[in-house]
UniProtKB/Swiss-Prot annotation:
Protein family: Belongs to the glycosyl hydrolase 73 family.
Role: Hydrolyzes the cell wall of L.lactis and M.lysodeikticus. Required for cell separation during growth.
Enzyme category, top tier: hydrolase
Pfam family, one: LysM
EC number: 3.2.1.17
One term under GO cellular component: extracellular region
Molecular function GO labels: amidase activity; lysozyme activity
Protein name: Probable N-acetylmuramidase
Reactions mediated catalytically: Hydrolysis of (1->4)-beta-linkages between N-acetylmuramic acid and N-acetyl-D-glucosamine residues in a peptidoglycan and between N-acetyl-D-glucosamine residues in chitodextrins
Signal peptide as annotated in the record: 1-57
Gene3D superfamilies noted in UniProt: 1.10.530.10, DNA polymerase, domain 6, LysM domain
This protein's record includes keyword NAD: no
Amino acid sequence: MPVSRVKVKNRHLKKKTKKPLAFYKPTTKFVGAVLIAGTLTTTHELLLQQTSPMVQAATNSSEAFIESIAASAKPVADANGLYPSVMIAQAILESNWGSSQLSRAPYYNLFGIQGTYQGKSVVFKTQEYLNGKWVTKDMPFRVYPSFNQSFQDNTYVLKTTNFGNGPYYAKAWRANAATYQDATAALTGKYATDPSYGASLNRIISQYNLTRFDGASSAGNTNSGGSTTTNTNNNSGTNSSSTTYTVKSGDTLWGISQRYGISVAQIQSANNLKSTIIYIGQKLLLTGSASSTNSGGSNNSASTTPTTSVTPAKPASQTSVKVKSGDTLWALSVKYKTSIAQLKSWNHLSSDTIYIGQNLIVSQSAATSNPSTGSGSTATNNSNSTSSNSNASIHKVVKGDTLWGLSQKSGSPIASIKAWNHLSSDTILIGQYLRIK
């Protein structure tokens, strides 16, 4: 449980009987209580049970946890223009150093994101403050195969959340934040309502030197860490090379592998490494081959592997409405001829709860784009693809309907129907609206 989200007025709860550890759902950003297995555990009491890991100095256990999540966080953050240091600090704060029930195996949900992931979820009783009172609800939380998918999902939230006025977290992106402090300031009041959220992240980043993970994921043709390269062949074709590299602050095996065009597994094998942990000043042998087109001479050019960014498509047009008394997602889906799943996807809703005065996207058509596959590639446009939404057919599920039956009726593959309606399983519900064509 994050320190920054605790109500000090609940200090008297320290004297109560110790209750099972629970987790806090950060997506709603409400300070409250969590009900696990029928036992109500306050957020303050959770803190009292878990204070030690939050105030400890850099120990072997904390460094081990940092390294274990950094291996997933850095490549994901680098590929999507985010600060790895900030993402790692968020994971530490949201999961209380991986001690929250939800962040541990078999759930691996570091950020408390609700919903399902590839059809898998775990249900816990939680309390939310709605309409002036606490309400206990059964809420599904996503279950991931590993920390890597948890970081990818959190990245998707940071890159694609849009309430109609542009990307909601754009100021936290590396392109718009000159320093990690700018990024944490941009998250404060948005990702978390606590005014000290950014300061808490900054303290973790500073104390554990997390900026060492903010180094460039690829470094062009310049060696800045001190390396000696020996070429065994300068002729045209494939040049086999052996390089001794000295680890510097901010280096990771993944970053080095990207810089020199070899895999992490190759580096580990060449240096008999049993993990991805490396140390400043450590000498690493980098062996591999680099493709070259030189017909002679001794000049080398380092080749880096480009990363792929998650860039949301810009909507060509969209319709938004302000929620009024009596509105429900089901009623809005019927009125605007779409599905509840689609409304939740457009508005990044983790539950069916909506609020009076909330702005919701109820209709949206995305502009088509042709990603480049490299220099000299040719993109072919199909003029029929831009009109696919105009022929969409919405079906209300009735008793006896199945995805297979609807696919036979509409002539659309089951996979397409699931993709259009963001279904993670083959389960459909009576009264549900589905796009089937």
